[in-house]
Each structure stands twice: as structure tokens, then as C-alpha cells.
Amino acid sequence: RREARLAAIAEAKAKIEARAEERDATEQAAYQEKVARREAQRKAGKKPRGRDPEPPTGGPRDKDQINFTDPQSRIMPVTGKGFDQCYNAQAAVDTESLLVTHVHVTQATNDKQQVMPLLTAWQGYPETLGKPDHLLGDTGYFSASNIQACHDHGIEPLLAMKRDVHHLPVFERFAADPPAPESEDPVEQMAHRLKTQAGRALYALRKHTVEPVFGIIKHVMGFRQFSLRGLDKVSGEWRLATMAWNIKRMHRLTAG
């Protein structure tokens, strides 16, 4: 029994180190992106806002853990509940039909790495399904690389650059559009777009689209948590849940 426990501990340690390497690579890429963006702003004669980013610290951390019940799950923040063992379920929803157009499940604790899988999936869809022209996402999806990736795929991104303000002051709500930036930087162009009347109206569709779908799946259809273990099985559960929503929604659409 002692040998088995030591072997399990050694295996857990190896997994923690492997996860730390993946996290280090992601954090280093994000750091380099921020540094490059600030340097580009300086070269353009603009002063970057805030302090320069601190380089990430590599290696395993004191709070890194392995779950022996479901090793593929990850500790993630849960709204109003602190932290729990979770998977990150993603879904893209069409703003007109409210049909789910793409789903996947990831072990990543944030959403910044989830834009490219979506764009890649959309690119492989049959032409008869049409092509999205905008991608609306909250601040969790914002990064300069995601904005550029959307443009590379012929899609205009509207990704919140800070937490949503639910009730804008009346003056801001009806203010004239600000002048367009002289810079062709995609991030600055998108920031301007989000400040225009048309851009705000378009982005506002997000809270009437994906949030109700998640809410109905949870509170009406009763799918509040995964019952199986492992990424593949959990992914299958999520596909079934969203498929059930699509069938429910298509029945509603065809019934008039």
C-alpha cells in the first residue's frame, strides 16, 4: 500500500509539473503580447496606460493541486461559491435564431484561448449554413491576438475590454459617436467601435443571446452539473445538453 501511495504521489507531482509548463507558456505568450503592444504604442508617440506588466513566475505553485477522482477536471472560480472542481463549457449562439452553432469543453480556467477553436470550427462548416460576420464576447475573451484572429477570418470582433456597465448614464447613452482613431491598430479600431451607438447596440445583443440560452439549459432544462468524469465524457454530455436545446428551439421556430 505504501508503494502504491508513493507511486500515486509521484504521478500527481509529474502532472502538476506538466500543467505548470503549459500555464507558463500561456502566461509568457500573454506577457509578450502586452509588452509588444505597449512598445508599439510608444513608437507611435502614445503613452501606454498603467504600469508595465510584470513577467510571469514559472514553475509549480503552492496552491497547485491534482484531483484523484477526476484528474482531468480543474479548480475554477465559481460565481458566488468560491472555487470548485470544474470544466469550462463553451457555446456560441446565433443572435437571430438563438441556436447553438458550436460547443466544446476545455480545462482552461479562462476564456482567452477559446476564440481560435471557435473560428476554426466555423471555417469548416458547409457554406449553406452561412458565415458569421461578428463575434460578440465579454471581457474574458479579449486579447489583441484574438482580435487579429477574427480579422484574419473575415469576422468583426466586438469583445469587451473591461467589465460591462449595465446602466450607462443618460448622457453617455445618447452621446454622439467619438471621432475615429487615426491608428489602424485593430484593438483601437474595436475600442472605438464599442463606443459608437451602432457598436453598443450590436454588442448588447450578447446578453439577449448566449446568457438566456445558458440560463434556460440550467434552470428550465435542469442541466446544472456534469454527471460523468473525464474530458471526453463531459464533452459528450455538453453536446447532448446543447443538442436538446437546439431541438427545443427549432420546434419553437417551426411552430411559429
What spans do the regions from the language model cover?
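Anion-binding and metal-coordination hotspots
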Residues: R1-G256
